[in-house]
């Protein structure tokens, strides 16, 4: 398994990781909460490592080697009783690349050394139908995918209500996706405010859970 994060979550890094996957058959996952991810039509898609320990263990089940580039080897966020803290399977060898090495240059060089193809699968342009009926987490996700503007910045602190959003927006016009800082909550509103100040020419969408919003309403 190739686990990526950080600077690899933009176009060049995503393409390089997809090229390596095409050449070797390695499974590519990304960290649970990427700082900034470029997503949408025309870009390679990558599955996130699940937040819940038992689901993350299922994703990593059977892995003999875990190559970690520009992120950290995955551990649980909390010491839940009877739950694993280290998420990779017993016997899996973890290879963590030095963070001082440029991760994009590294993966591009690896792809070239492997003779990896230049063309890789990317998300097709596609939007869900604009929904009707009751307001649910699923219909909110469909509406977001149907209406998302080009070059939007999405701040995602939807938490448990956001399960349907990644699938509904995968083929939307290209956008940036900003996530939480690890297991902490409360960053969504100030992060969206900062994004709007930094990028006044882009539309910013803040997907905010009600409990998380209570921490930073002053933003």
Regions from the language model: what does each represent?
Residues 1, 64-67, 153-155, 205:
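Conserved beta-strand elements of the Class I
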Residues 4-96, 172-202, 214-218:
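Glycine-rich, anion-gripping cofactor-binding loops and their flanking helix/strand elements
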Residues 10-14, 50, 54-57, 100-104, ...:
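Electropositive phosphate-/nucleotide-binding environments in soluble metabolic enzymes
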Residues 16-19, 55-58, 62, 105-113, ...:
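Alpha-helical scaffold segments in soluble metabolic enzymes
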Residues 22-26, 65-68, 112-119, 146-153, ...:
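Generic secondary-structure signature for well-ordered alpha-helical cores
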Residues 81-119:
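Terminal amphipathic helices with adjacent charged low-complexity linkers/tails
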Residues 121-201:
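Active-site diphosphate/adenylate-binding microenvironment
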Residues 209-211:
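Active-site beta->alpha N-cap acidic-glycine motif
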């Amino acid at each position: 398994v190739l686990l990526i994060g950080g600077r690899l979550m933009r176009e060049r890094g995503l393409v390089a990781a997809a090229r390596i996957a095409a050449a070797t058959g390695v499974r590519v996952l990304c960290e649970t909460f990427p700082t900034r991810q470029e997503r949408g039509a025309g870009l390679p898609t990558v599955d996130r490592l699940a937040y819940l320990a038992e689901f993350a263990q299922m994703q990593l089940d059977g892995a003999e080697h875990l190559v970690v580039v520009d992120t950290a080897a995955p551990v649980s966020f909390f010491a839940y009783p009877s739950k694993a803290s280290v998420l990779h399977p017993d016997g899996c060898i973890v290879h963590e690349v030095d963070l001082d090495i440029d991760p994009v240059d590294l993966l591009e060089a690896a792809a070239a050394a492997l003779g990896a193809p230049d063309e890789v699968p990317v998300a097709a342009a596609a939007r869900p139908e604009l929904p009707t009926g009751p307001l649910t987490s699923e219909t909110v996700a469909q509406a977001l995918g149907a209406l998302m503007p080009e070059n939007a910045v999405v701040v995602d602190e939807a938490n448990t209500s956001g399960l349907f959003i990644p699938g509904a927006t995968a083929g939307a016009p290209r956008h940036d996706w900003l996530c939480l800082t690890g297991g902490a909550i409360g960053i969504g509103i100030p992060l969206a405010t900062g994004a709007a100040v930094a990028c006044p020419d882009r539309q910013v969408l803040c997907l905010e859970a009600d409990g998380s919003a209570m921490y930073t309403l002053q933003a």
